[in-house]
Amino acid sequence: MKNLSFVFIFFVLLSCKNKKQADSVEQTRTSGTVKILVDESFSSIIADQIMVFKSDYKNAEFTTIVGNENKILPTFLNDSVRVIILSRMLTPDEDKVYRSRSIVPKTSRFAIDGISLLTQKDDLDSNITVEEVISILKGTSTTGKQLVFDNAYSSTLRYFKELAQITELPKRGVYTLQSNNDVIKYVSENKNFIGVVGVNWLIANNPDMTSYIAKVKTMGVKDIKGKKGSDAYYRPDQTNLINGIYPFLRNVYIINCEGRDGLGTGFANWLMSPRGQLIVLKSGLGPHKMMSRDFNLKNTN
């Protein structure tokens, strides 16, 4: 019985020691803890960035809260979590919320994402114009094509509602599901539907989706006459994202309202650093800026 009591006391003391060590980690740009709200469209690239960051800085601990834009933004504005990944900047009213607390939001673009339009691989029609997409969103299309989005509160759907200048979806022709994976599955199994999914999500290595992705293809998109990308149909490959020629582009931002020089600031700087931008480049997205490369040319004479 005494031995059991000794073991119990030992583990209690050990847990207290570990907790004390965790609590004593200094809060700096490369150590401590931070919570980050992440738009689910960009969860893959943020997970990659955090993994590499933590491999360099062992005392950095991240808690990510992933959700659609409408879900995570209220949490950010009520001061529960002060770092957020979004596909847009704060509105003037949202910006004032933090400024009223004497905190100036720091916003940094670190990547360029494209929004892919997907159709079944055996669909003969693999191209579409921006005008056609807008007509579907307005409910005036006569082509029979239909759009499927991840969910009713996503940043992707907001993007297209703003594009078409509508506040409500038509009763027919535009539908929302529950997730990006649901969109890919649905399009792979149903003809005449066009799935709308962010490039970062589409190219993420998700083994559960391999068989479904094999049954779909990305559509080429031609922009409105007079705009860049109106001369041909372009797909959302990395070159077209970087050149800005693919019509459906969106920036990816980290917005930091920590109000101090902590891990949130360090991670924001990391995303903009050559190392962070290289991870963006390898992910298939467009980096904020192209990194120059130095070559050592040896004289062999």
What are these regions (language model features)?
Residues 1-14:
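Sec-dependent bacterial lipoprotein signal peptides
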Residues 105-108, 113-115:
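Short, glycine-/small- and polar/acidic-enriched structural segments
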Residues 17-55, 111, 119-301:
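Exported/periplasmic ABC-transporter solute-binding proteins
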